[in-house]
Amino acid sequence: MLLFTILFLWCPIFGILAYAVFLGHQRKVSVKALVSLAVMLSLYLGCLGTTKELLGDFLTYKKMFEMVPDDGLWGYILSFGKEPVYYGYTYLAYYLYMGNWNLFVFSLTTLNYLLLSYCILKVGHYLRTSFINQIMALFFMAFFFQEFAAIGNMLRQGLAQSITLAFLVRWYIDRKHSWWIALCALGI
């Protein structure tokens, strides 16, 4: 794994493809290896998300992010009147990332893809699909044009969708009713 990590740091897409090819030639692939691939894909897409052009809703999200220092936590959250989880995270992230918009976008995009990957791997394991099919599903999700394009313009909605899917996967597959996850999705 160290070699693939180095390749990923040198050239992310090459590291991801090399690791996927390596996994594809194995007789058996562990869940840990599939999760590692999902993390690599999510980090790569998180980095790509920071390069998106500021248009439409994406520009509005940036303006809202830059408004954080104008108010206290509750004043900021209440000034929008909706999506308290998103604006609470925005407020905290502003200070956590020292006002760096790109780190904020990176965190949301990466989290979105990590959640989608979690869902794919959970469903794949539940259905007992081959690891090759799970790898293909991860790549399809990661490089599906409409999903990546929508993430920039509909950052909040994409994250809410991913959180909702994670809630449903936990509910139907793990039989765990994690209502706090559903409430997070509603608050985004």
PLM regions with names:
Residues 51, 103-111, 142, 151, ...:
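Hydrophobic alpha-helical transmembrane segments of multi-pass membrane proteins
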Residues 1-55:
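Transmembrane signal-anchor helices characteristic of membrane glycosylation enzymes that use polyprenol
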Residues 133-151, 158-165:
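Membrane-embedded helix bundles of polyisoprenyl
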Residues 164-179:
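Membrane-interface transmembrane helices that cradle and orient dolichyl/undecaprenyl
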Residues 107-127:
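Transmembrane-helix motifs of polytopic, lipid-linked glycan transferases
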Residues 178-188:
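Membrane-interface alpha helices of multi-pass inner-membrane proteins
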Residues 32, 120-144:
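Transmembrane-helix signature of polytopic, membrane-embedded enzymes
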Residues 59-67, 76-99:
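Short hydrophobic/aromatic helix or loop-helix immediately within or flanking a transmembrane segment
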